[in-house]
Amino acid sequence: MSGNTFGTLFAVTNFGESHGPAIGCVIDGCPPGMELSEADIQGDLDRRRPGTSRHVTQRNEPDAVQILSGVYEGKTTGTPIALLIQNTDQRSKDYGQIAQQFRPGHADFTYWKKYGIRDPRGGGRSSARLTAPMVAAGAVAKKWLAEKYGMVFRGCMTQIGEIAIPFESWDHVPANPFFAPMADVSELEAYMDRLRKAGDSCGARIRVTAGNVPIGLGEPLFDKLDAEIAYAMMGINAVKAVEIGAGFESITQRGTTHGDSITPTGFVTNNAGGILGGISSGQDLEVSIAIKPTSSIISPRQSIDIHNNPVEVVTKGRHDPCVGIRATPIAEAMLALVVMEHVLRNRAQCGDVQTQAEKPESASPQASFL
């Protein structure tokens, strides 16, 4: 199986299966000399970790990360960094009944047809559990980008099912299990309780941002920053759509309002999402993703088995009624990995480039000039 490595200069190779002994990744290209410990990574893994509330899967994995290589005396050495996360709470017997059946909405059918074999336990390689190593790698990228550029990556849920979530403050996001930017999440909790009792699932919309991004990241024509971001986000399990900036709202906007006017003190708006012509403009990167409803539900559904016989599929096991609830740190990590890759690329080619443009005195802190 190919397609397991993300990035080139900051390359992350992901390995493992949902119910295997362990999952992990190898990071190749991390600059040397950065202080790094498991504690620097564990915080983001804890944000993504299952079993943290009644609204997510009750699979109880500690997701404790181990650094196996690439760090000496507390600092990165420039050699590959191997990160390992043990699987400790597998319950493979839950998947015995569906081992020869294809669950609607899952990768079962396509994996079987492509490879002629599949691991049905927890989805095997197609499981969202494999996002944990990417969150770990993203934490490494976040740390380097924060230290070198002061970059800040944040995310929140802006919609769950039919419920739009108003933005109140970033301060509310870590205080509730939904990563919602609002103080009172009782409506969201009641909605999820009803959904779970009905044996159904729902989708979600997640917003992620990156602040203090330098101007100049992105490589036209085909490695544009927004193209790479979309590629990364679509690599997250269950993501079905990506928006940059105004996204689909651009359809109803006019050119007189969509184009972000520029003044001596900076941009007036950010409909472009911080990217112009595939290159970062210095504004915040603004990205939203749409996540489909969880495919693993207890309600019976029509399908076939590996012999093409009609079957009624009832999925057992422990599953997220909305995978979007834990997707915020995943989307943050993937955005950080894209930015890390392009910072290294831009430094290699354009590190000595200087222009006559001066930084506007009262421009936002995101609009830094290289």
UniProtKB/Swiss-Prot annotation:
Where does the chain bind NADP(+)?
A: 48, 54
- What PROSITE patterns does the record tag this protein with? CHORISMATE_SYNTHASE_1, CHORISMATE_SYNTHASE_2, CHORISMATE_SYNTHASE_3
Q: Pathway involvement?
A: Metabolic intermediate biosynthesis; chorismate biosynthesis; chorismate from D-erythrose 4-phosphate and phosphoenolpyruvate: step 7/7
Q: Which cysteines are joined by disulfide bonds?
A: none
Q: InterPro entries recorded for this chain?
A: Chorismate_synth, Chorismate_synth_AroC_sf, Chorismate_synthase_CS
Q: What class of enzyme is it?
A: lyase
The note on the cofactor says: Reduced FMN (FMNH(2)).
One GO cellular component term of this record is:
cytosol
Q: Which GO terms describe its biological process?
A: amino acid biosynthetic process; aromatic amino acid family biosynthetic process; chorismate biosynthetic process
Q: Which residues bind FMN?
A: 125-127, 237-238, 277, 292-296, 318
Enzyme Commission code: 4.2.3.5
Q: Which reaction does it catalyse?
A: 5-O-(1-carboxyvinyl)-3-phosphoshikimate = chorismate + phosphate
Q: Which CDD domains match?
A: Chorismate_synthase
Highest taxon in the source lineage: Bacteria
Q: Which Gene3D superfamilies does its entry note?
A: Chorismate synthase AroC
Which keywords annotate this record? Amino-acid biosynthesis, Aromatic amino acid biosynthesis, FAD, Flavoprotein, FMN, Lyase, NADP
Q: Name one GO molecular function term.
A: FMN binding
- Show the SUPFAM superfamilies listed in the entry: Chorismate synthase, AroC
Kindly list the cofactors needed.
FMNH2
Q: Which family does it belong to?
A: Belongs to the chorismate synthase family.
Report the protein's function: This reaction introduces a second double bond into the aromatic ring system.
Recorded protein name is: Chorismate synthase
* This protein's encoding gene: aroC
